[in-house]
Amino acid sequence: MTEQKITFADQKRKTVEIAEFTEDGRYKRKVRSFVLRTGRLSEFQRNMMNNNWATLGLEYQTTAFDFTQIYGNTNPVILEIGFGMGKSLVEMALQNPDKNYLGIEVHTPGVGACIAYAVEKQVKNLRVICHDATEILQDCIADNSLAGLQLFFPDPWHKTKHHKRRIVQPHFVEKIQQKLVPNGFVHMATDWENYAEYMLEVLTSAVGLRNTSATNDYIPRPDFRPLTKFEQRGHKLGHGVWDLFFIKNIT
């Protein structure tokens, strides 16, 4: 006997809870599965998400994630917010099997593409979430639990009246600091100079973060950060790219 209860976790997906019972009718457990709405997702992406969400996906919850249980080890965890289509995130996870990666993306086709690429490359040290990043940071990430935070090419909201919509704000950086372990890093990159200047201002103003730049501003693109499609696009348009790398001080 099974009973389905459908609840919408957000506007782009729905969660189906299936109650399982023993042969004599006693309640056994509930199994949560990830079911997608049709839309811009390709059939391939939809199938990859539905078939692999149990091993690669995480759901928002109101308590902190147990990373040791999730990944099966105590390796350092690096969080990336807004991974786009996920190619560079998967490549970083593939190149660093001694680290665990957690990616947040609200664009469902990007999540589907990331999962598909992770399955293709047989990546085991990666989990993804399709949810609002601020809620994940607030509710799901314990303080002093992240080895690093990556934010590559976020929406610049280049109009002045929209600057308040930028994810990089003083309160956001303060929250990141709480989640980082001592010597944990914040790595940001953008191809908008004005946003780079704003990122630098906010990060520099944060008490407890140290800029690793020799010139006290930006660093050259490190070899460990793969070129993203946004960066390649920026190069074609003649845009510069600015990397910022800060470390949380030991107190």
Swiss-Prot record:
Q: Which GO terms describe its cellular component?
A: tRNA methyltransferase complex
Which superkingdom, per the lineage?
A: Bacteria
Q: Which residues bind S-adenosyl-L-methionine?
A: E80, E105, D132, D155
Which reactions is this enzyme annotated as catalysing?
guanosine(46) in tRNA + S-adenosyl-L-methionine = N(7)-methylguanosine(46) in tRNA + S-adenosyl-L-homocysteine
Q: Where is the active site?
A: D155
Please provide the record's keywords in A-Z order: Methyltransferase, S-adenosyl-L-methionine, Transferase, tRNA processing
Q: Which Gene3D superfamilies match?
A: Vaccinia Virus protein VP39
**Where does the chain bind substrate?**
K159, D191, T228, K229, F230, E231
Q: Where is the signal peptide?
A: none
EC numbers for this chain: 2.1.1.33
Gene Ontology MF terms in the entry? tRNA (guanine(46)-N7)-methyltransferase activity
Pathway given for this chain reads: tRNA modification; N(7)-methylguanine-tRNA biosynthesis
Which family does the record assign? Belongs to the class I-like SAM-binding methyltransferase superfamily. TrmB family.
This chain's function reads: Catalyzes the formation of N(7)-methylguanine at position 46 (m7G46) in tRNA.
| Protein's name according to its UniProt entry | tRNA (guanine-N(7)-)-methyltransferase
Species source reads Histophilus somni (strain 129Pt) (Haemophilus somnus)
